[in-house]
Amino acid sequence: MKVSYHGHSVVKIETNGKVILIDPFLTGNSKTDLKAEDVKVDAILLSHGHGDHVGDTVELAKKNNAVVVAPFELATFLSWQGVNTHPMHIGGSHEFDFGKVKFTQAFHGSSYIDEENKTITYTGMPAGILFTAEEKTVYHAGDTALFSDMKLIGELNNIDVAFLPIGDNFTMGPEDAVLAAKWVQAKTVVPIHYNTFPVIEQDPYQFVEKLQNCTGKVLEAGESITL
């Protein structure tokens, strides 16, 4: 399994001949190395409905005939836009032909904001994502605060790599993320959701230096690890 980081919270997983994208915010993302028009994808996993996570989902899904796996309300909202969706919810898991997906808790918001009409559409609960294939497990925490049930996520799952937000302001910051890393017990921890906007500027190298009992790894856009 090859797992690569592409700026902000964008993660790509390549396994068994399939390509999976998590939170494909590409257009307008100054930190990504990907262009939506060049991306080929079989499945898209979404943690929640904010624009910097849904991103280019509709365009990518339609162009590639990709399935979008998302919390129920968000999946329903996207299905109304002509997207092939598979709705799930927190605590639920499903075995797909590309791997197993399970949604976990995350403490954040989830909505679609229409700036032009000044409306906000509720898109369900935010989630974290556990993805398992080839006997390897990836945990993408989505946007979240620190919460104590991360201990359960670590106890119940043998996590090979965890992608944790460190940007602060909208999510947990580096100090809380260090504790999150301890609780989820991943072998490798990669920081995400930082430096895309001024309000979430952080030094990822300082973060990984503080990690204990795991390998911290800063991935620049386009860099990958093999599990």
Curated annotation (Swiss-Prot):
Xref: NCBIfam families: PRK00685.1 (NF001911)
Pfam families: Lactamase_B_2
Domain of life, per lineage: Bacteria
Gene Ontology MF term list: hydrolase activity
Protein name as catalogued: UPF0173 metal-dependent hydrolase BALH_4194
Higher taxonomy: Bacteria, Bacillati, Bacillota, Bacilli, Bacillales
Family label: Belongs to the UPF0173 family.
Keywords attached to this entry: Hydrolase
